[in-house]
Amino acid sequence: MTAIRGAVNLTPSSAAAHSHLSRGLAFAGYSDEAIQHGEAAMRLSPLDPEMALFRGGIAIAHFTARRFDESLRFTEENLSLRPGFQGAQRLHCASLAQSGRVEEARAFLSTVRRNHRPPLTIAWVRENVPYQTPELMELYVEGLRKAGLDK
């Protein structure tokens, strides 16, 4: 995270640097700061073709802050920009489940499973999704389990 902060300090007008920092902070649980950097990225480059990544950091930040409805708002926007974006699909599924919309999450999981390469498993999530604390990883995995991901 130090290197990404350094990039933001060296080039504060870089939307990409703010976006990378936003996602790093979000995965570490620094939600409010992550949102600030995600918003900065969107402000600096409002027509950027990577807008889904900018919004992704904000969606993750809301999820880690347990603001699941806000996370859903951002994942829905991300999926409208990039329907096949696997990270947004997984987060959308976990956010639906954690917000209590378990039936919707279960239905959406079938879409996620159909499109996910390699096949989506809890083991794959633990190995590849970079939540930085056990608590945050468990929050995410719990959402996917509620949606019906069982192994």
Where are these regions (language model features)?
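Alpha-helical protein-protein interaction modules
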Residues: 1-12, 16-151
